[in-house]
Amino acid sequence: MTFILTETSAGYAVLKAKDKKIYKSESILEELSTPELVTSQFKVKGFSKFDSAASALEEVNAIVDGRVSDKLAALLNEFKDEKKSALVVADPKLGNAINKLDLPFDVVAESASLDLFRAIRENLPSLLPGLTEKDLATMSLGLAHSLGRHKLKFSPDKVDTMIVQAIALLDDLDKELNTYAMRIKEWYGWHFPEMAKIVADNIAYARVIKTMGYRSNASETDLSEVLPEEVEAALKVAAEVSMGTEITEFDLENIQCLADQVIDFAEYREQLSNYLNARMAAIAPNLTALVGELVGARLIAHSGSLVNLAKAPASTVQILGAEKALFRALKTKHDTPKYGIIYHASLIGQASGKNKGKIARMLAAKASVSMRYDAFAEEREDVPILGIDNRIKVENRLRQLEGKEIVGTVRPDVNKIEHKKVDLSTGKQYNADADTVGNTTAGADSDDEDSDSEEEVKEKKAKKEKKEKKDKKEKKDKKDKKEKKDKKEKKEKKDKKRKREDDDDEPKKEKKSKK
């Protein structure tokens, strides 16, 4: 007897095959090509329905991990009396797990049986009369989404990609705003140059251009919604005596178009900043409470994701963003940087120059703990308690280093402190005799010191003379050795020369004797 275990999105099904060796057939697809052939070959012997979507997800996770759940074990126990039977399963890991249950099945998990399961899944509505094809498709889609979310641990509120893109766009907007604001000041400055010194804010400058237009309209224009009263008065006075040139209406239209761009960019930047704050509060509330939204977002963007940032040690978080300076310092063997992006946190900005490195190190350590809690905690509180506690600790450490009062410590009760009585009687008088020049003891001490110093000088002088004599003797010995060597070499040369001459004279003497 052959049973086939089939996992569906609705539950577990155990099918009984008419042909005992169907799983060994080489032409399964031909034998099971139509729903009629499938229904004639297989009959449902047992079905265990999933109670809910959550239980379906748990069961599927167990199958993926190769585990036998309680629900599946209960279904298989119904067939424990079936002896000399085979159970065909699709997953070899699940087959090994079923073998450990000591059931009277010969578990079969072969690649050849995949065609069998393909044919069964294509004709499930025919085998399970209570389920339609539409119902199975809907349940399969929902279960697939649930399984995907579970694997990715996906949560729409924790998508840190939004933070990476938002902080990058915020930086781009800042650059564009600065460029446009500088351009509009240079452009409108030809008409009203004094206005740049009076109205320092770029957005207010653009709003004034949009509201006022020509400088000649300043006295008649109400700028109370744009500027403070004293600035408005100064602007109107400067407009009366301005040294700027006149511009045409066409010029003013283009300048006002640029002013509209600056205002729109500023409004969108504010909206984007609020969005970034909300995202950071949802994704990394403890990190935000410790270092702020912008610094936290830049850290996440630099590392790529919150999980990557949480995996980094505190020392890496401390110098994140200063990699170029770090490698240059390592190459030149100079001091490595103490901080990177984290330098812009408000807590480090409050520290004095000598304490910035210490606070940066402590802040990085606390930030590392906070971001790990944000990244890996399954349940979190509405209030970022960990981040606030860590911030208080860093602030207290900063006050301690700066010599200020520490917040949160128990102060002593002033009433319980015992104060010593102050003696207001006459204190010890100054001894004027100690200043006299003729003090004998002082003179004796000074004589002893002088004698000691003279002995030291003599001793040093003797050592110096001894060393000089030794050096002279060594030099003389070297010189004598060199002279002896030179004499010896000269003598050897003379002997060789004389011998050569004697050798040359002998043939001449022989010739003379023959003659």
From Swiss-Prot:
It comes from Yarrowia lipolytica (strain CLIB 122 / E 150). Residues 428-515 are annotated as: Disordered. Belongs to the NOP5/NOP56 family. Residues 283-403 form the Nop domain. GO terms for cellular component: box C/D methylation guide snoRNP complex; nucleolus; small-subunit processome. GO terms for molecular function: snoRNA binding; snRNA binding. It is found in: Nucleus, Nucleolus. Required for pre-18S rRNA processing. May bind microtubules. Coiled coil: none annotated. Residues 445-456 have a biased composition (Acidic residues). One of its GO terms (biological process) is endonucleolytic cleavage in ITS1 to separate SSU-rRNA from 5.8S rRNA and LSU-rRNA from tricistronic rRNA transcript (SSU-rRNA, 5.8S rRNA, LSU-rRNA). It comes from the Eukaryota. Keywords: Nucleus, Ribonucleoprotein, Ribosome biogenesis, rRNA processing. This is Nucleolar protein 58. Its main location: nucleus. PANTHER family: NUCLEOLAR PROTEIN 5 NUCLEOLAR PROTEIN NOP5 NOP58 (PTHR10894), NUCLEOLAR PROTEIN 58 (PTHR10894:SF1). The keyword Nucleus applies. The gene is NOP58. The keyword Nucleus applies. It holds the Pfam family Nop. Residues 460-499 have a biased composition (Basic residues).
